[in-house]
Curated annotation (Swiss-Prot):
Keywords: Membrane, Transmembrane, Transmembrane helix
Designated name of the protein: Uncharacterized protein C553.12c
Membrane topology: Multi-pass membrane protein
Broad class of the protein's primary localization: membrane
Highest taxon listed in the record's lineage: Eukaryota
Gene Ontology cellular-component annotations: membrane
Source lineage: Eukaryota, Fungi, Dikarya, Ascomycota, Taphrinomycotina
Subcellular location(s) per record: Membrane
Species of the source: Schizosaccharomyces pombe (strain 972 / ATCC 24843)
GO MF annotation terms: transmembrane transporter activity
InterPro entries xrefs: C553.12c (IPR039966)
């Protein structure tokens, strides 16, 4: 243990979750115990500074008893937002309190990045049979390369929120990230270049899945090796220790096992997340290969996809809340599942044939999930039912905060998904890459049209924003809860959520665009 460990424990996340009332290792204590296997993503001197940081206060109602602390180093290592936020907590809070800047950063930056990515003209040529083909190497390095880089960044930021890093400490995060990215492109090109598999979109999606799962395997294998060696040493040496030393060794080993168990559950959630990713891509290919669909089939698709993602969201939230005790990870994974759910439903709009179908899909998905369910679940009646069924020890104040957090995440996902859908509907219908995306061609022989899709989707977005605004007013008046204010406090307390929000948004949006491209090399 380092000399500053006791001081750090009082400064850094005394409890990782605001809604956990039992004793658990702090996130920094776990990072300290895991350090031998997985080094921390930030320099140690930035995490242990007794004079600069004040103790973390716990949430207790609409107001904090005292100002929350801010780690100026936390959002900055290797991340350009350092130059925007600076190193002062007051400046950081001021930026987040600005409605325009906050929403530009969290809800506009990711869609703009993805729209620019898919708008770049892809070099093409016609073969002797008149088939339009893509230049393979441009596609590999630029199109798939950026897609792969964002996926690796998203996985890396999740590890950072957990205060560990999957990269070898000798190489460092940046060098390892670049080398692994180049290696994944090299292996991918060798696998698909000489086979017909490269024409299949799902092949590239599978390669992306493998690229993201390898860091998880690396980190878990390192941790398992450390755990096995440490357990063997403990059992061998325990009998030789003095009674007092033996007691301390037992306590430290118990702490290590807790940290190992929590990290193992974190890995399980990552695997569930990647499973949703691969299932979503498969369902997209299945849905597109069986067009056209009736209103009934479209609604069944929406509900089946909603049920699948919601179930995975529920399981992941339960694991993160009860096993890893990380509020920040719960929030980030909720955004992933909500955005995955909504953005796939948005793309369904391009195959709806009448305004009536838009209304049915909207009632089945967005309005119900954004307004009706949040208002019902925040009531004290539902809270009491939740306590009765789950035996939760959370107070109503903490429960209300969690429900408000869920609603805020839904709003972010709604705006990001719809802004992106409207943007790439325009770009992929009128832009130079339109031949590669027949899904947005909207030929005159088809019952659906670009005009109906664009204007009906805009009307849907307006209705969602109105419903969201009314829901916020009801929460403020009847539940004494300020959605935006609590979100700002969360970001101040967990700054790493900001770059992770951006990374996960870009990754999910790219998943959808990539799944509908028509590949001919």
């Amino acid at each position: 243990m380092s000399d500053s460990f006791d001081a750090a424990a009082s400064h850094f996340h005394a409890r990782s979750s605001v809604n956990d009332s039992s004793f658990h290792l702090s996130r920094q204590e776990e990072a300290e115990l895991l350090e031998g296997a997985l080094h921390a993503p930030y320099p140690e001197e930035l995490l242990f500074d007794d004079d600069e940081y004040t103790a973390k206060t716990q949430y207790d109602g609409p107001r904090y008893a005292m100002p929350t602390m801010f780690y100026p180093n936390k959002p900055t290592p290797g991340w350009p937002l350092n130059y925007v936020f600076g190193n002062e907590r007051s400046r950081f809070e001021k930026i987040l309190s600005n409605f325009v800047l906050r929403n530009l950063m969290l809800q506009v930056l990711a869609p703009c990045f993805v729209l620019l990515w898919c708008a770049v003209p892809m070099p093409r040529y016609e073969d002797s049979q008149g088939t339009v083909r893509i230049r393979f190497w441009f596609f590999l390095i630029f199109y798939y390369g950026i897609y792969n880089a964002v996926g690796l960044l998203w996985i890396t930021k999740l590890f950072h929120i957990y205060s560990v890093n999957w990269c070898p400490s000798k190489l460092g995060g940046t060098i390892t990230y670049i080398l692994f990215w180049m290696f994944s492109l090299l292996v991918g090109s060798l696998v698909v270049y000489f086979t017909a598999w490269r024409q299949i979109t799902f092949t590239w999606i599978t390669l992306m899945f493998i690229s993201m799962i390898i860091p998880i395997g690396i980190s878990f294998s390192k941790l398992w090796k450390k755990h096995s060696r440490r357990t063997a040493q403990f059992l061998t040496q325990l009998a030789l220790l003095e009674p007092e030393v033996r007691s301390n060794a037992v306590l430290e080993t118990i702490g290590w096992k807790d940290a190992y168990a929590h990290y193992s559950w974190f890995i399980v959630v990552l695997l569930v997340t990647l499973l949703v990713y691969i299932v979503g891509e498969y369902l997209t290919n299945l849905y597109m290969s069986t067009l056209p669909h009736s209103s009934t089939v479209a609604i069944m698709y929406v509900y089946s996809w909603t049920g699948t993602v919601s179930l995975c969201n529920l399981v992941s939230s339960w694991i993160l809340n009860t096993k890893t005790h990380s509020y920040a990870l719960v929030t980030v994974f909720k955004l992933y599942f909500e955005l995955t759910l909504q953005v796939y439903v948005r793309n369904l709009y391009a195959r709806l044939e009448s305004p009536q179908q838009f209304v049915l899909v909207q009632i089945a998905s967005s309005l119900t999930m954004m307004s009706v369910i949040p208002l019902i679940t925040m009531s004290r009646t539902v809270f009491r039912l939740n306590v009765l069924m789950t035996k939760s020890m959370d107070s109503y104040v903490v429960y209300r905060k969690n429900m408000g957090r869920n609603f805020y995440v839904k709003c972010v996902a709604s705006n990001v998904s719809m802004l992106s859908f409207l943007g790439w509907s325009l770009i992929l219908h009128f832009g130079s890459n339109a031949p590669l995306y027949p899904y947005f061609s909207f030929s005159k022989e088809e019952p659906y049209s670009f005009k109906l899709t664009f204007y009906a989707s805009t009307a849907v977005w307006i209705s969602e924003m109105v419903a969201s605004y009314l829901t916020r007013l009801i929460m403020r008046k009847f539940y004494d809860f300020e959605v935006a204010l609590e979100a700002i406090r969360d970001f101040v307390e967990y700054p790493d959520m900001i770059p992770t929000f951006i990374a996960v948004s870009i990754h999910v949006l790219q998943n959808v665009v990539f799944s509908i491209i028509s590949l001919h090399f």
